[in-house]
Regions:
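N-terminal recruitment modules of adaptor/scaffold proteins
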Residues: 1-74, 79-122, 128-146, 151-181
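Conserved small-residue
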Residues: 116-637
Length: 637
């Protein structure tokens, strides 16, 4: 969509290919619109016609525009906020059968598609980028071209009735249809803005002579921070790449990089959707924008990239707590990327162990091997921590003349003795734990002490000692608001990890006692890094302790009686303020949210005469969360 009533047609699919026709299917039960279309592709065995389908959820459709074509046909224009899901049909249905499963559905013959292109293996040769300029005449950018136009047959009375039925059914689901006979359509080519931006360096499969296609007079040079923020606005839909002109690019290029970046950050922060990019400068003057003014020493600006099956989305640099690697290479922090693989619109994780997602797995493989291209930079895979692994993420790095990914990994430590792939990745991720370095102390005095073992069991696995003096320094450096000094700290120090217990009798002055079980690898980094401190918590039972107590002879009835008593207390707390205050102050959380909620109840925000909606709803949320913890972790008091 170029505007409210304007659309650029990038690729038309017309008529019939090898007796395979276009078809639309409306499924009211699953609330989705499906369009089937054929495409001719080239494979190793020759050329063939592949059947595709695009599935559009009703939740992705807000408004439909109905127009009339020059030959009096009805056309439906469907603009989508996010890319729909594309599938291709397997030509060999028998290959989708499996001996391991007893059930088979016809949907299993359809596999997810990440590209619609004539040469199927072409994308695997290039890095993942926002603007894919493949030299393929049948390439359809399904991640960026998110407006679909369907020209419906109106030659017969039956066809016209079916068209009206589609519009009426969509209207029942609050998808309004607006009739616009003045809707404008233009047949366009690739956006002009990419021709004016500085050309990328030649990569594998690309000839250097292609860089001479454009004259130097038409090239607009943008600094990387401005180029990155521009792609943030384009990938998020704040600016339309088809409406960005050379005038707009020249305007931001003539600004200072800081000022140009602020204008683009303003568009992303306000979530603007500008049909005319030149309006950005007027909106900025009228509303203004206040960026992040001060970054604490233990934080840094992190650029995040979300890779979906069909496109890529960039995020404005955000302030986050740093890690050991980011602190070491703070002078080139803009060369780090934190990436995450998700479904479309970040709806969740990509499903694993699903044969229909092979193309999505190939896209992940392409990202890991070929990298991510932003401007003239190509970011390569570096490593991932445990927290990134849980959300399907990783860290990428763009090499410089003096620093490569291998150089960073060598600085992180010696991992050559680790032969298990999973353990190797986990040890690399140990350096990416979010930590706070103890300032003013480059390296504490480290003493190695043995583990305590009895009958083949290690009773001190991962537990070292720290002096009370160092513990006090940590409390002051982290400005902890605590009533009692923490008794233990979760830490990282070089290749060591685990917890350090405050031990005044053994650890003196600046000493840290590390056990052999805490040492995972050798590293040149010796600074003490703290992840979190011990805090007060309410002692409860859990599934593990219940299992142990039952094996020691405690009857199960004892636990069920305690559980019933606690459930009755939660129900009574929704009626009796005294019971609610008692339970809220007894089961407190680290953020002291329960204490604040108890103060609201104590201040008569919930009485027989006054039921303040916010307090009542938060109390219901507290009860639901507590019951969830009882069900999942058996936290019985």
């Amino acid at each position: 969509m170029l505007g409210h009533k304007s659309m650029k047609i990038m690729y038309p699919i017309v008529g019939t290919i090898h007796e395979r026709k276009l078809k639309i299917e409306l499924n009211l039960k699953f609330q989705r619109l499906t369009a089937f279309f054929p495409m001719e592709i080239a494979t190793r065995g020759g050329r063939m016609v592949r059947q595709y389908k695009v599935v559009i959820d009703f939740s992705n459709m807000k408004t439909i525009y109905q127009t009339t074509t020059a030959d009096n046909c009805c056309a439906l224009v469907i603009p989508l906020e996010t890319p729909p899901q594309y599938y291709w049909k397997s030509p060999n249905i028998r290959s989708t059968f499996s001996d391991e499963t007893k059930n088979w559905s016809f949907t299993e013959s359809w596999s997810r598609a990440t590209d619609v292109i004539e040469e199927a293996g072409l994308p695997m040769k290039f890095p993942v980028t926002l603007h894919a300029d493949f030299k393929d005449c049948n390439f359809v950018d399904i991640g960026r071209w998110t407006t679909l136009r369907f020209v419906l047959n109106t030659s017969t009375e039956e066809a016209r009735a079916a068209n009206n039925q589609i519009v009426s059914a969509l209207d029942d689901f609050n998808i309004t249809t607006q009739v616009h006979d003045s809707f404008q359509f233009t047949h366009g080519v690739q956006p002009e803005m990419w021709k004016h931006l500085k050309r990328q360096v030649p990569i594998e499969g690309q000839k250097a002579s292609q860089m001479l296609d454009y004259s130097l007079d038409s090239v607009v040079h943008l600094s990387f921070e401005v180029r990155y923020q521009l792609e943030v606005c384009i990938s998020r839909g704040h600016l339309n790449e088809h409406t960005i002109t050379k005038e707009f690019l020249d305007t931001i290029a003539n600004m200072s990089p800081t000022k140009a970046k602020l204008h683009l950050e303003f568009a992303a922060d306000k979530a603007l959707r500008l049909a005319d990019p030149m309006n950005l400068f007027q909106r900025y003057r009228e509303e203004g924008f206040v960026p992040i003014s001060r970054i604490p020493p233990y934080c840094g600006l992190v650029r995040k990239v979300v890779i979906t099956p069909t496109t890529i989305r960039y995020t404005t640099p955000n302030m986050e707590m740093s890690n050991r690697v980011m602190r070491k290479y703070k002078h080139i922090e803009d060369r780090f990327l934190r990436i995450q693989f998700t479904e479309e619109l970040e709806k969740g994780r990509i499903a694993v162990n699903k044969d229909q997602n092979d193309e999505i797995y190939k896209r992940v493989l392409r990202t890991m091997y070929k990298g991510i291209r932003i401007g003239d930079r190509v970011y390569e895979f570096l490593a991932f921590g445990n927290s990134q692994l849980r959300v399907n993420g990783a860290y990428f790095f763009c090499p410089t003349q003096h620093t490569s990914c291998d150089d960073i990994r060598r600085w992180m430590g010696q991992f050559s003795h680790i032969k298990v792939v999973a353990k190797y990745a986990a040890r690399l991720g140990q350096c990416f734990s979010t930590t706070r370095e103890l300032r003013g102390i480059s390296s504490p005095e480290t003493r190695h002490i043995p583990d305590i073992e009895r009958n083949g069991y290690c009773f001190t696995d991962g537990v070292g000692k720290i002096s009370s003096f160092l513990a006090q320094l940590i409390v002051e450096d982290m400005t902890l608001d605590v009533f009692a000094k923490p008794s233990a700290f979760q830490f990282r120090m070089g290749g060591c990890k685990g917890i350090l217990a405050v031990w005044p009798n053994d650890a003196k002055s600046m000493e840290v006692h590390v056990r052999e079980s805490q040492k995972k690898f050798e590293s040149n980094s010796k600074g003490l890094e703290i992840i979190r401190c011990a805090s007060l918590a309410t002692a409860t039972l859990n599934r593990q302790t219940i299992t142990i107590l039952e094996s020691l002879g405690v009857p199960t009835r004892s636990f069920t009686d305690l559980l019933d008593q606690q459930l009755k207390s939660y129900e009574l707390a929704m009626q009796d303020n005294d019971v609610a205050i008692d339970m809220l102050t007894k089961f407190t959380d680290e953020q002291k949210t329960h204490v604040h909620l108890a103060n609201l109840v104590r201040a008569d925000f919930r009485t027989k005469d006054l039921q303040e909606p916010f307090v009542v709803n938060v109390l219901k949320l507290w009860r639901a969360w507590s019951l969830k913890m009882l069900k999942e972790k058996a936290r019985i008091q």
